Amino acid sequence: MKLQNFKFHGSGLERFFGPLEARIMNALWDAPDELTIKEVQQTLNRDKEMSFNTVMTVMNRLVDKGILSKKSVSKSYRYRPVLSRDAFLEAQSKELTFELVQEFGSRAVAHMVDALEQVDPDLLDQLERHLKQLKKER
């Protein structure tokens, strides 16, 4: 999956989506089943009033981007994310890492290792085990 417009200064899903897109995606990921636009609107309205047309426009743009799928049921459409939240974040982090390494090479790798040490030394141990496994598989 192509990397969404990543924003370094955002947080959470807003690194990949606009604020309303992120709220819509969270509503759909948190739902046990597919939702209609009206159901998403009702979920969003708990926090902030949103017009039906605004929600519909954003959801259809997410369909156009390949993030959501929709299917016709009775007289309405039901929407769902193409990927689970975990699968989406996995794909995006993989693509981001690939692009950083492709663009910045060993500098990016060195900074990632430094970040692992600062943020969570256990992650550095996991990386070391992963590297050993990759070397065995060669």
Model-derived features with residue positions:
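Short acidic, hydrophobic short linear motifs in intrinsically disordered regions
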Residues: 34-43
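Short, hydrophobic-biased segments on the C-terminal half of alpha helices
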Residues: 56-60
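Short alpha-helical segments that sit at the start of domains
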Residues: 1-26
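Short helix-coil junctions and helix-kink-helix linkers
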Residues: 42-50
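Amphipathic alpha-helical dimerization/coiled-coil segments
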Residues: 93-133
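Glycine-centered, phosphate/nucleic-acid-interacting loop/turn motifs that mediate DNA/RNA or nucleotide
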Residues: 66
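Short, cationic-aromatic polyanion-contact patches
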Residues: 16-20, 73-92
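Short beta-strand "wing" residues that participate in macromolecule-binding interfaces
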Residues: 70
